[in-house]
Amino acid sequence: MMPERFKLVVIPQTRGQFQAVKSLIERKDVAEIIIATDAGRDGELVARWILAKAGNKKPLKRLWISSVTDKAIRDGFAHLKNAKEYENLYHAATARAESDWLVGINATRALTCKYNAQLSCGRVQTPTLAMIAAREEEIRHFRPKPYYGLQLTGKGITFTWKDKKSGSSATFSKEKNEEIYKNLSGKTAVVAEVKKTKKTSQAEGLYDLTDLSRDANQRFGFSAKQTLNIMQSLYEHHKVLTYPRTDSRYLTTDVAETLRERVEAIAVGPYRSFTNTVLKGKITPKKSFVNNQKVSDHHAIIPTEQPVILAQLSVDERKIFDLVVRRFLAVLYPPYEYEQTKITLECEGETFFAEGNVPLNRGYKEVTAPDGDESGKVFPALKEGEVIRDFSLKKTEGKTKPPARFTEGTLLKAMENPVKYMQQKDAKAAKTLQETGGLGTVATRADIIDKL
């Protein structure tokens, strides 16, 4: 079924609402129309279809905001956009809606007829289901393989054997493992290298919806749909978090100018000590989270300038709010600093290594892991060339494991970057998927997973 032209039809249940809007559009004292639907592709489509069905010819303006606080709404109305700036967004939404219809109705009919069963097919749901099915096949046909390793313990340190050619700490050859063990027994080892390096680790980037959904699934077992619903409440009802359906992990420079007000708004309860630390100094926007070029429709999910009252949030809302707030504060904190020590041993031509980190400055981990045990691994002092005579050897072994089944969190990640799951190599299709952000959008993935 390939219609020459798609017709818009008003849903019977909402006909009264449509007529009310249509009558307002047609009023003679209304000179222009302001589109104030959800600031996104689907919100644009809803408004444009209503206007098209109503036969509107009046000039259009667009209210485009990322939070629904009173301040944000007033600022939005003070800086209305020309609706022509969003024409391409409307056309993209139309193309998606029509392609969904064409693929859905034709492929579903074909599958149902061929297999004599009620089977549905969708532009996004079917490739997603294919990834799940392929992973299940991989698990079903997986055969574990045993592997072997060696550990050397001396001077209070446990070292792990490393193959000089492959760099792997295990071998699939039991005979090789036995041979190395016999050759090293009763021998001496020499400290080949002691390398100490000061390193830093930056906080993870701000949340987009996919990243937030993955964390919420991993930590709390929330489904993607559940996380989106909670986020919608925090955005629309409580007005304490910004627009949820975003695919960006960056802020624009104009939003970065409001960081202090946003930090002040969350200076309550468990966050007060962290916000006090941030507010004591100058808040400097960093390139790691401020980049105009990496924000399309909406910036990353962050707190709004509206002060939060934690007692008004439900238990689940508190959990999601806590994730966002701690990630937000973490990027404003200094990096985590530590000293990494790498020790390499040589014994009869074989190499063993040990590695440990000692924290120097916890930095952002004060926020993200306040109760974290990071005392570090402090090694006894060893010098290069030092001989270790009294050491013990231990053979280790294990079996390879099949790939894990998808969780909602890992499935979201796969939908975001499905190229590596493609069974047929297609450079053009791979490039398109990378440019468009994968299967579905941050706004639709939760529904697709829920449907499957």
What are these regions (language model features)?
Residues 1-420, 424-428, 433-450:
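Toprim catalytic domain recognition across nucleic-acid enzymes
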